[in-house]
Amino acid sequence: MKFTFLKLTMMAFITVGAFSCKNTEKEAETPVEEASEATEMATEYTVDTDASTIMWEGAKPTGKHHGTIKLSSGTVHLNNGNVEAGEFVIDMNSITDEDLEGDDKAKLEAHLKGTVEGKEGDFFNVKEYPTAKFEMTGIENNVVKGNLTIKDKTN
């Protein structure tokens, strides 16, 4: 089963990343909610990370880019066909761009990963923060809500 909420998660993920570039203004405080807990009746499923890909899109005034990122691990808890809880660990080193080629592709990926010397903090700084995490806090009207942790900051 493919989860639509992974697309929603990535949109939130890219939004957080897009605004993390050297912003000196005070960061907005977003309340962190308790992660959903599965009931005793729920069945835990492990995400097939080889078959799972998160698609991302990032935009700026001069254009946009899109690509993929992989999961390191993940679990989903179902009870009578309904998702009750879930947690996903995202492999930040796996972020790739799919709309550029050659040097431009390599430069953008290095910029996003934070592997450019002197610009490690611009986006994801994968050397210091190799993973991100999404924990579900609930589902309302088929929209998954959750806490996204990137670079040890949870929103």
Q: PLM features: residue spans?
A:
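Hydrophobic helical h-region of N-terminal Sec-dependent signal peptides
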Residues: 10-15
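C-terminal motif of bacterial Sec signal peptides marking the signal peptidase cleavage site
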Residues: 17-20
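Low-complexity, acidic/polar, glycine-enriched regions of mature
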Residues: 22-155
